[in-house]
Regions:
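A short, acidic/glycine-rich surface segment
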Residues: 2-4, 40-41, 50, 70-75, ...
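Exposed loop/turn and edge beta-strand positions of beta-sandwich/beta-sheet ligand-binding modules
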Residues: 49, 82, 120
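Core segments of cupin and vicinal oxygen chelate
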Residues: 11, 20-62
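Short amphipathic alpha-helices within nucleic acid-binding modules
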Residues: 94-99
Length: 138
């Protein structure tokens, strides 16, 4: 049984999602080019070699992409624990179709759609940077 927190939740919201990547600049360019992200100038900790960018979107959502050169990059199975995809709303079926076609033409693998799912969502899903899935929806 779910119980409600005794704390009011009107001020709670998702602030950001962080994603480690091997190629920070390629990841940054992907989100800027295809999904309209605005990037900060980046952060670099010279002692640890950690680098990151915060990518901001018009609705206030933020994605932090991060890199540590020595971090291993294990194979990413589609059926695994952890996040399944990051979804981006583009506003219309036509825009889902157009962005999916553009990504496919640019060499990204489309793994589903564009289609209407069993629960009524119009979407497509692509394998974007480094095996991570991006869902494009209305």
């Amino acid at each position: 049984m779910l119980s409600q927190s005794s704390q009011p939740n009107q001020d709670r919201k998702l602030n950001s999602i962080a994603l480690y990547v091997k190629d920070l600049e390629t990841a940054r360019n992907f989100f800027v080019k295809y999904l309209g992200a605005k990037s900060n100038e980046g952060y670099h900790n010279t002692k640890t070699s950690f680098r990151s960018y915060f990518l901001s979107f018009d609705d206030g959502a933020r994605l932090e992409i991060m890199n540590k050169p020595e971090m291993p990059d294990f194979p990413k199975e589609f059926a695994r624990t952890g996040y399944a995809h990051i979804a981006f709303s583009v506003g219309s079926k036509e825009k889902v179709d157009a962005l999916t076609a553009e990504l496919k033409a640019d060499g990204y693998e489309v793994v589903s759609g564009p289609r209407t799912t069993g629960d009524g969502y119009y979407e497509s899903c692509i394998v974007a940077i480094e095996g991570n899935q991006i869902e494009i929806t209305v």
